[in-house]
Amino acid sequence: MNAERLMMVLREPHTSEKATVMADKFKQFTFKVLKNATKTEIKLAVEHIFNVKVKSVSVVNVKGKSKRFKQTSGKRSDWKKAFVSLHADQDIDFTVTE
């Protein structure tokens, strides 16, 4: 797997109330990822970027919501969400910048 592809797989961390609780209690972090990314690619990308050991990866395809503006109806984009579980002694700190 080339490093350029691994850097593109993770788009951004997904922050919500549920994601924050999961990170604090269970060491499970949530990311928005490319729609065509596989579990193996996500695992390798997290291990490569954050220097941690990944325990497991679960993915969910999120359907975009239908939205209306006056008479025009539209749809937000579909996206993929990845739940990454780390080993007990590992942690990711998003506040540190390099």
From Swiss-Prot:
InterPro entries: Nucleotide-bd_a/b_plait_sf, Ribosomal_uL23-like, Ribosomal_uL23/eL15/eS24_sf. Coiled coil: none annotated. One of its GO terms (molecular function) is structural constituent of ribosome. One of its GO terms (cellular component) is ribonucleoprotein complex. One of its GO terms (biological process) is translation. Keywords: Ribonucleoprotein, Ribosomal protein, RNA-binding, rRNA-binding. It comes from the Bacteria. Pfam families: Ribosomal_L23. Belongs to the universal ribosomal protein uL23 family. NCBIfam families: PRK05738.1-3, PRK05738.2-4. One of the early assembly proteins it binds 23S rRNA. One of the proteins that surrounds the polypeptide exit tunnel on the outside of the ribosome. Forms the main docking site for trigger factor binding to the ribosome. Part of the 50S ribosomal subunit. Contacts protein L29, and trigger factor when it is bound to the ribosome. This is Large ribosomal subunit protein uL23. It comes from Legionella pneumophila subsp. pneumophila (strain Philadelphia 1 / ATCC 33152 / DSM 7513). The lineage of its organism: Bacteria, Pseudomonadati, Pseudomonadota, Gammaproteobacteria, Legionellales.
